[in-house]
């Protein structure tokens, strides 16, 4: 990510400068900044991530100004608005010090759902980001699971979705039986030894108090 993202940003910045009236250029520039922002969040680089958030919002708003039909652009804007509102106090103080725009939880979620329902390019990414939001912030576990199961149905060869379903069933619903079935399906899908799967099944055995998992 750290190697390829700068190249993507350089290329899309050049594209936007070369064709400033091309909505797609600004849309993909926002996407390139988004990749770097996620990488910075994972590395706890809050200052850089906050600045990238502003760049994402600006690029996508410019794309929409050039082409209001570009529904996908609403997703990144909504994501910024949502997290800017639900962020911890320290992050909000950082935003204030950097003179970054404020957020709105309700409108941000509305924008994300609008992009998900009307767009085509970002459906899977939107569902993945939304399941995190529903799980962690909206406390709507059934909706999060519904999105994960939809991702699993559309991307059956990606084992991540099965793993997340199993973890959610266990941690949030305390449905050990359902979690057991999902972990076993994941083991079958991977068809081999996997340390993470063994740990998951071992935890289920501990919770059930037997070795029938």
Q: PLM features: what roles do these ranges have?
A:
Residues 97-102, 116-120, 148-157, 185-192:
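Solenoid-like repeat scaffolds
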Residues 19-20, 48-49, 139-142, 173-181, ...:
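Structural helix-adjacent loops and short alpha-helical linkers that scaffold large soluble proteins
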């Amino acid at each position: 990510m750290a190697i390829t993202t700068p190249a993507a940003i350089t290329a899309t910045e050049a594209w936007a400068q070369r064709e400033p009236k091309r909505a797609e250029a600004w849309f993909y520039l926002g996407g390139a900044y988004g990749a770097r922002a996620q990488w910075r969040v994972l590395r706890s680089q809050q200052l850089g991530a906050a600045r990238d958030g502003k760049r994402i919002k600006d690029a996508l708003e410019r794309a929409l100004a050039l082409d209001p039909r570009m529904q996908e652009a609403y997703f990144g804007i909504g994501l910024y608005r949502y997290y800017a509102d639900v962020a911890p106090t320290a992050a909000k103080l950082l935003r204030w010090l950097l003179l970054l725009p404020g957020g709105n939880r309700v409108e941000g979620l509305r924008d994300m759902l609008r992009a998900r329902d009307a767009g085509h390019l970002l459906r899977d990414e939107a569902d993945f980001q939304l399941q995190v939001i529903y799980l962690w912030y909206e406390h709507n576990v059934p909706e999060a699971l519904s999105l994960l199961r939809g991702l699993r149905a559309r991307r059956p060869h990606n084992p991540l979705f099965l793993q997340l379903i199993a973890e959610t069933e266990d941690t949030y619903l305390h449905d050990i039986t359902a979690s057991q079935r999902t972990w076993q399906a994941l083991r079958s899908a991977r068809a081999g030894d996997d340390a993470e799967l063994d740990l998951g099944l071992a935890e289920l055995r501990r919770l059930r108090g037997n070795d029938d998992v």
